Curated annotation (Swiss-Prot):
Sorted UniProt keywords: Ribonucleoprotein, Ribosomal protein
Organism: Pseudomonas syringae pv. tomato (strain ATCC BAA-871 / DC3000)
Cited function: Involved in the binding of tRNA to the ribosomes.
SUPFAM superfamilies, alphabetized: Ribosomal protein S10
Family annotation (InterPro entries): Ribosomal_uS10, Ribosomal_uS10_CS, Ribosomal_uS10_dom, Ribosomal_uS10_dom_sf
Binding partners and assembly: Part of the 30S ribosomal subunit.
The protein, known as: Small ribosomal subunit protein uS10
């Protein structure tokens, strides 16, 4: 696995969960002897929804909702066999989407 790099992208709606998961990944990678770049916070995507409260009249009465998608990127430089095995066995919190790519 020499001269390779693992890029890990994390997405979650809760910033505490994503920070906890990135911390676990960083600790696991460093414990196995790999060099870690990051976590790099990417821009948070904010989706806003406006819903009419009244089903018939009163168009001025509305509720607004927002959902935020937090993203982080980690690069693991020169991973070892131990690093890959440890990352595969790592159990992260539910609600965190993980994408792993080799490059």
């Amino acid at each position: 696995m020499q001269n390779q790099q693992i890029r890990i992208r994390l997405k979650a709606f809760d910033h505490r969960l994503i920070d906890q998961s990135t911390q676990e990944i960083v600790e696991t990678a460093k414990r196995t002897g790999a060099q870690v770049r990051g976590p790099i916070p990417l821009p948070t995507r904010k989706e806003r929804f406006t819903v009419l409260v009244s089903p018939h009249v009163n168009k001025d009465a509305r509720d607004q909702y927002e959902i935020r998608t937090h993203k982080r990127v980690l690069d693991i430089v020169q991973p070892t066999e131990k690093t890959v095995d440890a990352l595969m066995k790592l159990d992260l919190a539910a609600g965190v989407e993980v994408q792993i790519s080799l490059g």
